[in-house]
From Swiss-Prot:
Domain HD residues, every copy: 28-140
Similarity section: Belongs to the 5DNU family.
Family matches, as NCBIfam families: PRK03826.1
Residue numbers binding substrate: R16, W17, H31, D67, D75, L76, P77, T78, D135
Keywords attached to this entry: Cytoplasm, Hydrolase, Metal-binding, Nucleotide-binding
Cell location: Cytoplasm
Name this protein carries in UniProt: 5'-deoxynucleotidase YPO2559
């Protein structure tokens, strides 16, 4: 018997942004799906508009599993995780142990297939960068949603993420930011108007 998927099912019980007041709580499971949507889109944009040659479906899978180890470690708040390089380095080691523990829950004949999704060492540098871009973009989108709902708790997080996005800047991310991001600050009525025309 394997407990792998029973563990992954519990990602929905782990809330993100645990130290901040949220208008709407976000869990790791739904965050992972949104990161998969965005990473997939970034890969397609890169391929279609900027001469990329990425496997968009693989990118979506990598993004889906990118926080899977948090079912064991929990979601450590960013200010703590990156407080200093030593803490960040040690936390990476903890994540690695958690990833290995998850992989060992699988039947032997499936372990390699999932190791390629759970362990960043199997990602190309380009795949890793794209998933990190999508992860940061989704955190930024969460900030926009919270701010548009009147929650000023996310002002500093938004400013920090804008710096992160500037560091991770790419043509495909610029395209995504210009074409898709503005809608996240609008109401349902506003985003529905264009759809009905």
């Amino acid at each position: 018997m394997s407990h792998f998927f029973a563990h992954l099912s519990r990602l929905k019980l782990i809330n993100r942004w645990p130290l901040m007041r949220n208008v709407r709580t976000e869990n790791v499971s739904e965050h992972s799906l949104q990161v998969a949507f965005v990473a997939h889109a970034l890969a397609i944009i890169k391929n279609r508009k900027f001469n990329g040659n990425l496997n968009a479906e693989r990118i979506a899978l990598l993004a889906m599993y990118h926080d899977a180890s948090e079912v064991i470690t929990g979601d450590l708040p960013t200010p703590i995780k990156y407080h200093n390089p030593k803490i960040a380095h040690e936390y990476k080691k903890i994540e690695k142990v958690a990833q290995q523990k998850l992989i060992e829950m699988l039947p032997k004949e499936l372990q390699h297939d999932f190791r390629c999704l759970l362990d960043e060492h199997y990602y190309s540098e380009e795949e890793k960068a794209l998933v990190k871009q999508a992860d940061a973009l989704c955190a930024y989108l969460k900030c926009l949603e919270e701010l548009s709902a009147g929650n000023n708790e996310f002002i500093q997080a938004k400013a920090r993420l804008e710096k992160t996005l500037a560091i991770r800047q790419s043509p495909e991310m610029d395209y995504f930011m210009a074409v898709f991001v503005p809608s996240f600050s609008l109401s349902l009525d506003e985003i529905s108007l264009d759809s009905l025309d």
